[in-house]
């Protein structure tokens, strides 16, 4: 109901953004509040999303046994539970973090529940693009909890995680193609075909690789992050290009792209948490002049 896998993934990205901004000077109370508060907000969004999606979930093999579909738990109870989680999560962020971190959490929540779940997912091929913003909010909330300002580092994180969401989501849409088609959800592979979806996956991974490299180039992380982002992004890109091989098994290929997307973003979140740059260190761009 609250999708623990999604919550855990967001915890890693929140921690990555927080520790990147903290630069070794970690306020444990603030970090814990950011992690718990954002996790509750994400859990709230997932629970309410299940209420909204119960009609289309009934048509999909992957989701047809959710409690909101089977009636095991009344929809009203799930909705009340989700709202309670949201109130608690936003309250923690309001009490312990700052206005900017709270604002990003609120905007991300509204976009996911109000814009994506209620309308875009069902009606537009651009639903994935809109939803990618919400998926990119957690590391920015973690980062802004420390800094209290929207600087270049926060902007890079927002763009980087938004770009990552696209090939990750398109890969899911390919290996779950039959589910999305049955529910008449206009994700890119269903609405415009596999060829276009494959192209978008490759292009988004390429741009993601370039944007990820901006963190070390702008002085927010060091050489270790640059090495990890180059290695993982190039491997992911090479894997995506295999989709153009003659006779490729699209289901298997999409699962590989999806699986490595999780490895990539986890590796980058952990590395940026450890390889932050302190003020006395020079950005990589200044070292190559």
UniProtKB/Swiss-Prot annotation:
Pathway: Porphyrin-containing compound metabolism; heme O biosynthesis; heme O from protoheme: step 1/1. It is an enzyme of class 2 (transferase). The chain crosses the membrane at residues 4-24, 28-48, 66-86, 99-118, 124-144, 155-175, 199-219, 221-241, 256-276. The keyword Oxidoreductase does not apply. Disulfide bonds: none annotated. One of its GO terms (molecular function) is protoheme IX farnesyltransferase activity. Coiled coil: none annotated. GO terms for cellular component: plasma membrane. CDD domains: PT_UbiA_Cox10 (cd13957). Its main location: membrane. It is a multi-pass membrane protein. It is found in: Cell inner membrane. Keywords: Cell inner membrane, Cell membrane, Heme biosynthesis, Membrane, Transferase, Transmembrane, Transmembrane helix. One of its GO terms (biological process) is heme O biosynthetic process. Its EC number is 2.5.1.141. It comes from the Bacteria. It catalyses: heme b + (2E,6E)-farnesyl diphosphate + H2O = Fe(II)-heme o + diphosphate. Belongs to the UbiA prenyltransferase family. Protoheme IX farnesyltransferase subfamily. Carbon 2 of the heme B porphyrin ring is defined according to the Fischer nomenclature. HAMAP family: CyoE_CtaB. Converts heme B (protoheme IX) to heme O by substitution of the vinyl group on carbon 2 of heme B porphyrin ring with a hydroxyethyl farnesyl side group. This is Protoheme IX farnesyltransferase 2. It comes from Shewanella baltica (strain OS195).
